[in-house]
């Protein structure tokens, strides 16, 4: 009888996890679909995708002066990556029910009575970070 009640608890837990995940997807909205069209505007009449050009960010020459022979005009240095480095990281295995690899650092003391909770599980943290009890509350921390 005990194994049956355990299986019922596991089934209820999995159903609750699924419902929470679906609710979070509804709150965040569908991925990859951009903004809704403006009222009264047909979707076919849109301008199409926006193209971004990276302009030459060098120094302009002063009018009436030639560059010094043997020297190139100073060029500004572009960043290595245009996108956010956290979002550019590949997803880490360890999803909804399985934790990410690594060990949370040890916590010595937290003076707050009711510390804030910034994440609930590892899947809420980007990249390699894990949801660990930090100095005060729970937060996304790089594991050891």
Swiss-Prot record:
Instruction: Please provide an example of a Pfam family that matches this protein in its UniProt record.
Output: Cementoin
A GO biological-process term: innate immune response
Entries under SUPFAM superfamilies matching the protein = Elafin-like
Taken from the UniProt record, the cysteine pairs bridged by disulfide bonds within this chain are 104-132, 110-136, 119-131, 125-140
Please give the residue ranges the record annotates as the region 8 X 6 AA approximate tandem repeats: 34
Q: Which GO terms describe its molecular function?
A: serine-type endopeptidase inhibitor activity
Sorted UniProt keywords: Disulfide bond, Repeat, Signal
Q: Where is the signal peptide?
A: 1-21
The tissues in which it is expressed are: Large intestine (relatively low levels).
Report each sequence repeat as a residue range: 34-39, 40-45, 46-51, 58-63, 64-69, 70-75, 76-81, 82-87
Segments carrying the region annotation (Disordered) are 28-49, 64-85
Q: The WAP domain covers which part of the protein? A: 97-144
Q: Could you name the Gene Ontology cellular component terms for this entry? A: extracellular space
Protein name in the entry:
Protein WAP-3
């Amino acid at each position: 009888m005990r194994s049956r009640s355990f299986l019922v608890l596991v089934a209820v837990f999995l159903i609750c996890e699924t419902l929470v995940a679906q609710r979070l997807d509804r709150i965040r909205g569908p991925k990859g679909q951009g903004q809704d069209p403006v009222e009264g505007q047909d979707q076919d009449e849109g301008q199409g995708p926006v193209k971004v050009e990276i302009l030459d960010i060098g120094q302009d020459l002063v009018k009436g002066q030639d560059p010094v022979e043997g020297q190139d005009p100073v060029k500004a240095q572009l960043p290595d990556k245009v996108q956010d480095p956290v979002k550019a990281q590949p997803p880490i295995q360890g999803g909804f029910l399985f934790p990410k690899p690594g060990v949370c650092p040890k916590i010595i003391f937290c003076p707050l009575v009711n510390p804030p909770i910034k994440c609930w599980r590892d899947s809420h943290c980007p990249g390699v970070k894990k949801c660990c009890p930090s100095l005060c509350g729970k937060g996304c921390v790089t594991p050891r």
